[in-house]
Amino acid sequence: MPHVDSATLLADLDPEQEAAVRATSGPVAIHAGAGSGKTRVISRRTAYAIATGVVPADQVLVVTFTEKAAKEMVERLRSLGLPGVTARTFHAHALSQLRHFWPAWHGGAPLPELLDSKLPMIGRLARQLPGHYRFTPSKDLADEIEWAKARRIAPHDYERAAEAAGREAPIPVDLFIRIFGDYERAKARAGRIDFDDLLVETVTLLEADPDATATVRARKRWFSVDEYQDTNPLQQRLLELWLGDRDDLCVVGDDYQSIYGFTGATPAHLLRFR
């Protein structure tokens, strides 16, 4: 790997950015909005930690919220002379782990095929609803299913959980529970999983298999999470399982810009971060 000059990484930063880049150990929270140069800070901080010997490049994981952001981060790090750093979404990293561990957990069977979108399947099920409810937008139903799965709420537990959260389903609750359950069963019959299942199954596996968890933790030990205000409870739990009792975690976000709240994300994780 090419030598990276740590001084060069600090040369064009303002004082606040430099302080963030130099904070390479322990839990770090960076509150930064759009236009603040946060992507540059994340990439420089990562490069600085590697250049100063804090962590090897192959033990770093930068978590982004979109594939586009992950690709941009990889390109930025490559331009800094660091081609070996992993930058992925929660779902992409979970997928890589499931592909590795799934066969051992399921009698050698490969990981089921991933649905590109849950909307077509939900749409077909929605058309079987009575009366005008069959015209309910599939996106509204999908969002509510995502909210539930972000909290590992099964269909039969939905009514109680939604009431406790003060949440109203897009259709009468009995019909929503029917759609939710039918959707889960339809996926199982088709031998498919969705993007929510990637996280649910990874969390379930890591909670139940200490050996798998130890393997995962041995591979990555230094974490940065961008757009942390958009993490949901399931992603937060997965992050905790990846991290274990270590504290080399940097979260970056802006609690005024949470854009995924309707599917269960909350800026509370950022606001409570220690």
Language-model features and meaning:
Residues L80, F101-G108, L125-H132, A148, ...:
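Alpha-helix C-capping/helix-to-loop hinge sites
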Residues L115-K187:
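Coupling/switch/interface segments within P-loop NTPase motor domains and analogous charged loops
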Residues V74-R76, R99, G123, Q236-R237, ...:
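Short amphipathic alpha-helical segments
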Residues A51, R78, L82, L95-P103, ...:
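Non-catalytic alpha-helical coupling and interface elements of nucleotide-dependent molecular machines
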Residues M1-G108, P112, A214, A268, ...:
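P-loop NTPase Walker
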Residues V4, T8, I50, A148, ...:
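Residue-level signal for pocket-adjacent positions within structured domains
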Residues L10-R22, G26-H31, V41, L61, ...:
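Conserved helicase NTPase motor core
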